[in-house]
Amino acid sequence: MKAAFARYRLDFINPAGTSRGVLYKKDTYFLKICDEQCPERFGIGECALFKGLSAEDNDGYEDKLRELCHNISQGVDTDLSAHSSILFGLESAILDFSNGCRRVCYDNGFATGDYHIPINGLVWMGTKDEMIARIDEKVNAGFGVIKLKIGAIDFEQELAMIRHLRTRYTDKDLTIRLDANGGFTPDNVGERLKRLSEYAIHSIEQPIKPGQWEAMAKVCEESPIPVALDEELIGITNPMMMMSLLRSIRPHYIVLKPSLMGGFSGSTDWLKMAAQFNIGGWITSALESNVGLNALAQWVAMLQPRIPQGLGTGALYSNNIDSPLEQKEDYLWSNPEKMWHLPEFEWINVD
């Protein structure tokens, strides 16, 4: 077997605002594996490094990719316990190769176009008027569940926006999920959650910054809004630590991003452990291109989700990879009449 990797820069169509700043571009990597005797047929996976959020965001990232590619050619295993995004890319590439190099990681109803995955509509941070306009656009497109990024602008403005939203859409018309990205503090989180709870909020992700287990446990116990852990899970791959976190904090939900949380294998472990505590959850993308989103969606389809997932990010980029993926109202599906068109990547081969 032989492996190579390539860099690729994704450009946002519109700046994406979060509590950590505004995103204009995102660098990602692709990994391919092939048989040396037939290099034109290869499995591909996306190593979706998330700068500023991934635990593996450091200067040694490409060195790890080189090590992996070299080890694959030598038939040697590579320790990827601290590199979730590379593990996600490797798992995807191996699965794709095993399924005939057809961009199929899991050969199920989603891959054939027969199964559609329910998704929420993501609304990025902006001014009150900008966010209301984006929400209206999502509702008009058919979304029944909206996820709002909050925590970047003045809280009173955000509250006014949600209040205004509820005057137009009841909780029967529209389900609202919130994602604070750790934007609140232990001192103000209780009062803010109480005020937000007046507007029939489904859940709020990561209300305070990760790493404050005792404070987060208190939030989960006292919050009038169900709390979901997101960033709290990043970088934790030891099974004992995973179990300890869930037992200590007892969130209502976990939100899994396989690129950041141990790939498919690690995320499966999180789901199994969460089930032991009756903790629910859903899956979201980590701003992957269509290559990563496709692999992720095929995996999610195996779970047969009953609630909307966070997989609606394929339309964010002006230079995304042409693929069969399409959004149809509030569903993601794979159109069997469309083909993959990979760009001419500049593959970096490692001996």
Name the predicted role of every residue range.
Residues 1-176, 181-183, 197, 322-351:
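N-terminal capping/lid subdomain adjacent to the active-site entrance of alpha/beta enzymes
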Residues 47, 206, 311:
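Active-site donor-binding loop signature of nucleotide-sugar glycosyltransferases
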Residues 69-76, 252, 277-283, 305-307:
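A short pocket-lining beta-strand/turn micro-motif at the edge of beta-sheets
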Residues 96-100, 275, 298-301:
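Short glycine/serine- and small hydrophobic-enriched flexible loop segments
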Residues 153-294, 298, 317-328:
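Catalytic core of soluble alpha/beta enzymes
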Residues 286-351:
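C-terminal alpha-helical cap/extension of soluble enzyme domains
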